[in-house]
């Protein structure tokens, strides 16, 4: 019975939508880091781990809630997770220069400042390494 529920949840639209949003968020996040030239393996690994754990967590919560016939709660949780991923995707696109809604301007400015600081820190480190800055 549990196996059938796991298959039912895996074939469901909710899991497919969540997977698509997670994949798109990961891709836009990678492209954002690549555009700003701040890619590093640790950040990418953290992103893969975070997205994978989010997907696995929701999948098993959905299986459990389907098992106890309370999937309505799971759908509410999924809407919250999907909104978080949609916001993250819009933030990634905005940092890359794509048009964004006005309500996201402050968040995007924070992200831009973060990446600018990372770039400045990298330049300082490079200058120190070359012996140009004392």
From Swiss-Prot:
Pfam family, one: Phage_holin_4_1
Subcellular location: Host membrane
Keywords: Cytolysis, Host cell lysis by virus, Host membrane, Membrane, Transmembrane, Transmembrane helix, Viral release from host cell
Keyword presence, Transmembrane helix: yes
Residue ranges crossing the lipid bilayer per the database entry: 15-34, 55-73, 78-100
Gene Ontology cellular component annotations, sorted alphabetically: host cell membrane; membrane
Signal peptide: none
Recorded topology in the membrane: Multi-pass membrane protein
Main location per the UniProt record: host cell
A GO BP entry: killing of cells of another organism
Family as reported in the entry's similarity comment: Belongs to the bacteriophage holin family. Cp-1 holin subfamily.
Protein's job: Produces a lesion in the cytoplasmic membrane allowing the phage lysosyme to attack the peptidoglycan.
NCBIfam families xrefs: holin_tox_secr
Name of the protein described by the UniProt record: Holin
